[in-house]
């Protein structure tokens, strides 16, 4: 059954996550999980490469959304700034739950952020990778 989107933001987020998965697979990551959810948080993508786990947060923004950002602030527009301290704390708890539930608490891991800039009309995307975010 296809996913039903309740908002344009959710649709953009889902497309961005799909683009992120393709990007990771192209760069030799194995995708282990998507949208791992607990009541206290969510992990967008869990991937593995070279025997290391990667917990990936995806932030997506469409060109249509960017058109509402003024020219003066566009150069400084950083969706990664939406990684608020409370979000990081919730993510840390969710990661610990994931590791324990999968018996992976001894495995090396890191948190990365993929910022996906979408041009939905042109069907293009640019990806910015922010590696090893400190929780």
What is the predicted role of each segment?
Residues 1-34:
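Acidic-basic catalytic patches of nuclease active cores, encompassing PD-(D/E)XK
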Residues 117-135:
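Short, low-complexity, polybasic intrinsically disordered segments
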Residues 24, 43-68, 91:
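Conserved catalytic cores of phosphodiester-cleaving nucleases, focusing on short active-site segments
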Residues 38-41:
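Short acidic/glycine-enriched loop/turn segments that link adjacent beta-strands
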Residues 60-117:
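Catalytic cores of nucleic-acid endonucleases
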